[in-house]
Each structure stands twice: as C-alpha cells, then as structure tokens.
C-alpha cells in the first residue's frame, strides 16, 4: 500500500554512501550509525504517496524500508539519536508537519494567485474562497437590532431542541432578514439560500454540528425545500453527493428560515414552527 512517510536502514561496508534525493522528496534526515555493523538510518517524507519499491529506488542501495509508525517528528528525533551515532545527521528539504499542508498551499496562493490559477484552478478557487470568507469574518457589523431581531436573538440563545424550526416572516422586504442571516455566519452558522436537497446536505455535511440559516430569496419562495430542513433538523440524514455518508448527530441545533412567505402547513407540521413576524 502507498504511503508518504517511511523509515529506512541501509547497511554498508567501507566508505559511507552519499545519499542524494530529487524533487519527489519533501524531507529526509539520516545519520551514520554503528551497532554490530555500519549502517545509515533515516526517515524520508515524500510529496506524494509511493509504494515500497519506489521508496527503495529513491533511497538507493537496496535499503530496508518500513512505513512510519507514530509521527514524523517522533521518527525524525529517533533516527538522530546520539547513542549509536558515528557521523551526521544530515537532512534534505523541509519537514511538513501534520496539518501544515493547507497553510503552505495558502501561502503559495497569496504569493502568486495568477500562477496558481493557471496551474491548479480548482485549488486556486478554494484558496480564494477561504481568503474572502476570512475577510468577511473579520468585518465587524454594528447592528441596531429591530424588535423582531431582538426577539430572534433571544430565542437562538436558548438551548435548541430536535424539532423546532424558527420561521422569520417578512413579506415586504427590506426588514433586515438577509443582513441578520449573513451576520450569523460570523458565529459559525451554516448559511444557505436553498437549492436541491443533496447540494444542501453535501455542504452541511462538511461540519454537521452547525446551527442553520436558510435565507430564501423571494424568487425561490415557491420552491421552499422543506425536505432538507426536516432532515437537517432531525439530526440524521444521508449525504449522497460525491462521497456518500450517513450522518447521525447527538447535538441539537437551531434552524432559522428567513422568508418573504409564510410556511406551507401542507408540507410541514405546524407544531414544528415558531413564527417571528418582521
């Protein structure tokens, strides 16, 4: 099976072999050790996962290689131990710690977004979305709460249950529904304008313990997705888009619908709905 982090031992007699690596290697560290015989012991971290035979070819000299157990930091420290060291240690490249790849990708994007757009447009798109959201989250909005907003604010500070859907109804527009809904994003809420059920569930499944805000445009009022609302509020649903996953969550969340129309009692149980009029 392919892996990116490996440990290796290369036995030798006579002159110390010189190790050299190419662009496939992210990081390597090794030293000359002597126990019962001379050998090189080291770790190697590849930029992409590779199989056993490829790793041996990269190191050269028919080494013994094993998939790394534990963290790359622990393995790196172990192969640099002083007790059996004869010479070294030597290193190549930069250690990529767990969780640091995303930061490095973002750094590359910020350094030259146009270059990444040409080479990897999908990654550039995600990096730009992340940058824009971070800028949005930093922006502080001073809201003078209207009476309905104060009522909603107090309600979402209470403990959510597994049934109640809060329906904010304002038929005229301009009441501040969308402004309030977008502000909730800064407090970790999931924001959606609606759409197809599996599209909504796929996006929500990325972090399914978030509170939920449906900010429904007037033009979409006739296509209100009650199915998605109930599935998300019930805390058990299947997201079948791209990567199928069944999700069951113990944590209850608030679900708020901001709409220009009243709810349809033929499509959702009336006892679920708490109405706030704008």
UniProtKB/Swiss-Prot annotation:
Pfam families: RNA_helicase (PF00910), Viral_Rep (PF02407). Its cofactor is Mg(2+); Mn(2+). A divalent metal cation binds at residues 33, 39, 83. GO terms for biological process: DNA replication. A motif (RCR-3) lies at residues 78-81. A motif (RCR-2) lies at residues 39-41. A motif (Nuclear localization signal) lies at residues 48-69, 95-101. The active site is at residue 78. Changing residue 78 to F: Complete loss of DNA cleavage and nucleotidyl transfer activity. A motif (RCR-1) lies at residues 8-11. ATP binds at residues 176-178. The keyword Nucleotide-binding applies. One of its GO terms (molecular function) is RNA binding. There are 3 rolling circle replication (RCR) motifs. RCR-2 is probably involved in metal coordination. RCR-3 is required for phosphodiester bond cleavage for initiation of RCR. Initiates and terminates the replication only of its own subviral DNA molecule. The closed circular ssDNA genome is first converted to a superhelical dsDNA. Rep binds a specific hairpin at the genome origin of replication. Introduces an endonucleolytic nick within the intergenic region of the genome, thereby initiating the rolling circle replication (RCR). Following cleavage, binds covalently to the 5'-phosphate of DNA as a tyrosyl ester. The cleavage gives rise to a free 3'-OH that serves as a primer for the cellular DNA polymerase. Homooligomer (Potential). Rep binds to repeated DNA motifs (iterons). This is Para-Rep C1. The lineage of its organism: Viruses, Viruses incertae sedis, Alphasatellitidae, Nanoalphasatellitinae.
